[in-house]
């Protein structure tokens, strides 16, 4: 597909067919050696897309209360896509990170603060120098509570931007979570395995105001 095509989301009818077999990944997280798939009792899951998932995953695995992180694909149509397929723009997915966290230590609201303050949510189908629908900003809530918090935080961040003199509209997609597909193992904890690797994320200098 051309770069122009990759700036527009593919329709479900035109998406690649994919496959039934999940991507094989390591059993344990390369940084903290926690399970890559299990969710311990009392913990919750969050899904965020902020551009290239290498830097995004590192941002979240460093936080106290985060049990595990995983790079993957969300918000699209093609089952079990490959990285190459996602980069073609023909699967509909965003590069996303799955975060398993302990809400007794770090809240979803705190995760949203990290989300908003560490990327540019106004860039549409790109993030920085990374162009394509897979780099879009997105939040994929799993519960009505997460959905309400995501929308409320978006409104607060838009107001904070305006107060700072930035009147660009937020383009972040907020949509109920569809299946999350793990990326290939080489992409998991990529910046731990490749500490001098590419990290293209950065905020716009605006802070998320606290929930009233």
Curated annotation (Swiss-Prot):
EC number(s) from the headed UniProt entry: 1.8.4.11
Keyword hit for Cell wall biogenesis/degradation: no
Leading EC class: oxidoreductase
Domain of life: Bacteria
Task of the protein: Has an important function as a repair enzyme for proteins that have been inactivated by oxidation. Catalyzes the reversible oxidation-reduction of methionine sulfoxide in proteins to methionine.
Matching Gene3D superfamilies: Peptide methionine sulphoxide reductase MsrA (3.30.1060.10)
GO biological-process terms attached to the record: cellular response to oxidative stress; protein modification process
Gene Ontology CC annotations of this record: cytoplasm
Name this polypeptide is given: Peptide methionine sulfoxide reductase MsrA
PANTHER family per UniProt: MITOCHONDRIAL PEPTIDE METHIONINE SULFOXIDE REDUCTASE
Catalytic center residues: 52
Phylogenetic placement of the source organism: Bacteria, Pseudomonadati, Pseudomonadota, Gammaproteobacteria, Enterobacterales
Keywords: Oxidoreductase
Family: Belongs to the MsrA Met sulfoxide reductase family.
Taxonomic source organism: Salmonella paratyphi B (strain ATCC BAA-1250 / SPB7)
Pfam families in the record: PMSR (PF01625)
Reaction equation(s) it catalyzes: L-methionyl-[protein] + [thioredoxin]-disulfide + H2O = L-methionyl-(S)-S-oxide-[protein] + [thioredoxin]-dithiol; [thioredoxin]-disulfide + L-methionine + H2O = L-methionine (S)-S-oxide + [thioredoxin]-dithiol
MF terms (GO), sorted A to Z: L-methionine-(S)-S-oxide reductase activity; peptide-methionine (S)-S-oxide reductase activity
